[in-house]
Curated annotation (Swiss-Prot):
<dbReference type="InterPro" id="IPR008980">
    <property type="entry name" value="Capsid_hemagglutn"/>
</dbReference>
<feature type="signal peptide">
    <location>
        <begin position="1"/>
        <end position="16"/>
    </location>
</feature>
<dbReference type="InterPro" id="IPR001364">
    <property type="entry name" value="Hemagglutn_influenz_A/B"/>
</dbReference>
<dbReference type="GO" id="GO:0019062">
    <property type="term" value="P:virion attachment to host cell"/>
</dbReference>
<feature type="lipid moiety-binding region" description="S-palmitoyl cysteine; by host">
    <location>
        <position position="564"/>
    </location>
</feature>
<comment type="function">
    <text>Binds to sialic acid-containing receptors on the cell surface, bringing about the attachment of the virus particle to the cell. This attachment induces virion internalization of about two third of the virus particles through clathrin-dependent endocytosis and about one third through a clathrin- and caveolin-independent pathway. Plays a major role in the determination of host range restriction and virulence. Class I viral fusion protein.</text>
</comment>
<feature type="lipid moiety-binding region" description="S-palmitoyl cysteine; by host">
    <location>
        <position position="557"/>
    </location>
</feature>
<dbReference type="GO" id="GO:0016020">
    <property type="term" value="C:membrane"/>
</dbReference>
<dbReference type="GO" id="GO:0020002">
    <property type="term" value="C:host cell plasma membrane"/>
</dbReference>
<keyword id="KW-1015">Disulfide bond</keyword>
<feature type="disulfide bond">
    <location>
        <begin position="106"/>
        <end position="151"/>
    </location>
</feature>
<feature type="disulfide bond">
    <location>
        <begin position="58"/>
        <end position="290"/>
    </location>
</feature>
<feature type="glycosylation site" description="N-linked (GlcNAc...) asparagine; by host">
    <location>
        <position position="26"/>
    </location>
</feature>
<keyword id="KW-1168">Fusion of virus membrane with host membrane</keyword>
<keyword id="KW-1160">Virus entry into host cell</keyword>
<feature type="disulfide bond">
    <location>
        <begin position="294"/>
        <end position="318"/>
    </location>
</feature>
<keyword id="KW-1165">Clathrin-mediated endocytosis of virus by host</keyword>
Length: 568
């Protein structure tokens, strides 16, 4: 009879109504890294590192780039005859120059402070070329014979279009005194130069005067140049050299020139009509007839991701450059949680619902929720409130990362002349160091955010579990796997009240108490039976052992093996 009662009680426990707390799971194989773990499979993840580009040069926000093709910046500004297509250029978004353009300074020489001029151009979007000293105004000097075979055009000798090489006229080179007043409202880029002959004979042949000079002055510039006559190897068929200079002439300022020979005078200057963000990119790409918001020397980027690893030099609304190969942000939950019977903490942030047995693929309309079973059936239901709060918490995670790294180090494509190579090497090391630190910060932040996100989800499951536990109290039993077994009947209406937090504990407490006591009574009665059996077994075993010892002693006494003495 006792066995029958115990069996019925056990069956009734198995079939009791239950409610379980769990979380969403799916077939995702996406993995993320955290501070504590690598390759954690999650239900949802977002790649935040852009790795692709289109391999083309594109318009930037509808404005075409100035692609110099085979011309250099110097060839364009001075007017190399092979760069006539760039005599007048419209507004540009950025400038593209090849690494080694063929049409540079056709007459050999150098451009003074060339790198600084390029840096200036990275803040300019439009030039307007204006004539400041007409070529026809040099009545006392030969302004037409200053050409060279080094600068050919249509098979004939020519020269830079925007400057004039002045030669003696009628065996005389009168001293030049010429001024230009900048009456424009914009700054003016003015260029001029000096010719360094090969020998004294060439000096007098071209300029008559054996000793010459060039003086240039503005409100901020005071320059005096003299030619350096020396024998040099031929470059482009020329033993002479030319050196070019530039300055920015402010509005209402004047530039004064004085020279008695070797002067390369400005004819045109560039009015800076629009300033803005620009850059000079070194690229061999061709124009792709496309539009973009972000351009790199490798191609255009069309992405909403916060980071990229394509090239450190960019222009436009671009993701931030890092050296990383992988940055994946967790937005969902662990998809393969540990299955444990006891609570366990892991991670850095908050409590972990490690006692939950596993995720539910059957729950598709939320991240966290319930599974119930009673006489009316069973089913899954998402907890809308906790799910929505979690969604709100991770929706702005990408923006949060950007805000935390809101000071981007910009790698600027600087150029250095031969005398500044050590500075260039130091600059490259500094840029590499900055990028290394920037990359480390980005990777560390993603790892920490992933750890925080996964712990955040686990904590939400734990909070949902505690919400149910505090409602049910002793009306249900905790099974240790995220489930509760009711001590009373709980129909669908009852289940719904548990889910929405309106469970009426007093309503079910009496039924739960009776069932709980009945189960406890069965256990106690069974325990008493087991105690009686245990005592009986112990006494019987002891008695049998005593009889065996007594019999053995009598046998040994009878055959003389043991002497027995009874003393009274």
């Amino acid at each position: 009879m006792e066995k029958t009662v115990l069996l019925l009680a056990t069956v009734s426990l198995v079939k009791s109504d239950q409610i379980c707390i769990g979380y969403h799971a799916n077939n995702s194989t996406e993995q993320v890294d955290t501070i504590m773990e690598k390759n954690v499979t999650v239900t949802h993840a977002q790649d935040i590192l852009e790795r692709t580009h289109n391999g083309k040069l594109c318009d930037l926000n509808g404005v075409k780039p100035l692609i110099l093709r085979d011309c250099s910046v110097a060839g364009w500004l001075l007017g190399n005859p092979m760069c006539d297509e760039f005599i007048n250029v419209p507004e540009w978004s950025y400038i593209v120059e090849k690494a080694s353009p063929a049409n540079d300074l056709c007459y050999p020489g150098n451009f003074n402070d060339y790198e600084e001029l390029k840096h200036l151009l990275s803040r300019i979007n439009h030039f307007e070329k204006i004539q400041i000293i007409p070529k026809s105004s040099w009545s006392n000097h030969d302004a037409s014979s200053g050409v060279s075979s080094a600068c050919p055009y249509l098979g004939r000798s020519s020269f830079f279009r925007n400057v004039v090489w002045l030669i003696k006229k009628n065996s005389a080179y009168p001293t030049i005194k010429r001024s230009y007043n900048n009456t424009n409202q914009e700054d003016l880029l003015v260029l001029w130069g000096i010719h360094h002959p090969n020998d004294a004979a060439e000096q007098t042949k071209l300029y008559q005067n054996p000793t010459t000079y060039i003086s240039v002055g503005t409100s901020t510039l005071n320059q005096r140049l003299v030619p350096e006559i020396a024998t040099r190897p031929k470059v482009n068929g020329q033993s002479g050299r030319m050196e070019f200079f530039w300055t920015i002439l402010k509005p209402n300022d004047a530039i004064n020139f004085e020279s008695n020979g070797n002067f390369i005078a400005p004819e045109y200057a560039y009015k800076i009509v629009k300033k803005g963000d620009s850059t000079i990119m070194k690229s061999e790409l061709e124009y792709g007839n496309c539009n973009t918001k972000c351009q790199t020397p490798m191609g255009a980027i069309n992405s909403s991701m916060p980071f990229h690893n394509i090239h450190p030099l960019t222009i436009g609304e671009c993701p931030k450059y890092v050296k990383s190969n992988r940055l994946v942000l967790a937005t969902g939950l662990r998809n393969t949680p540990q299955r444990e019977r006891r609570r366990k903490k892991r991670g850095l942030f908050g409590a972990i619902a490690g006692f939950i047995e596993g995720g539910w693929q059957g729950m598709v309309d939320g991240w966290y929720g319930y599974h119930h079973s009673n006489e009316q059936g069973s089913g899954y239901a998402a907890d809308k409130e906790s799910t929505q709060k979690a969604i709100d918490g991770v929706t702005n995670k990408v923006n949060s990362i950007i805000n935390k790294m809101n000071t981007q180090f910009e790698a600027v494509g600087r150029e250095f002349n031969n005398l500044e190579r050590r500075i260039e090497n130091l600059n490259k090391k500094m840029e590499d160091g900055f990028l290394d630190v920037w990359t480390y910060n980005a990777e560390l932040l993603v790892l920490m955010e992933n750890e925080r996100t996964l712990d955040f989800h686990d904590s939400n499951v734990k909070n949902l579990y505690d919400k149910v536990r505090l409602q049910l109290r002793d009306n249900a039993k905790e099974l240790g796997n995220g489930c509760f077994e009711f001590y009373h009947k709980c129909d669908n209406e009852c289940m719904e009240s548990v889910k929405n937090g309106t469970y009426d504990y007093p309503q079910y407490s009496e039924e739960a108490r009776l069932n709980r006591e009945e189960i406890s009574g069965v256990k106690l009665e069974s325990m008493g039976t087991y105690q009686i059996l245990s005592i009986y077994s112990t006494v019987a075993s002891s008695l049998a052992l005593a009889i065996m010892v007594a019999g053995l002693s009598l046998w040994m006494c009878s055959n003389g093996s043991l002497q027995c003495r009874i003393c009274i």
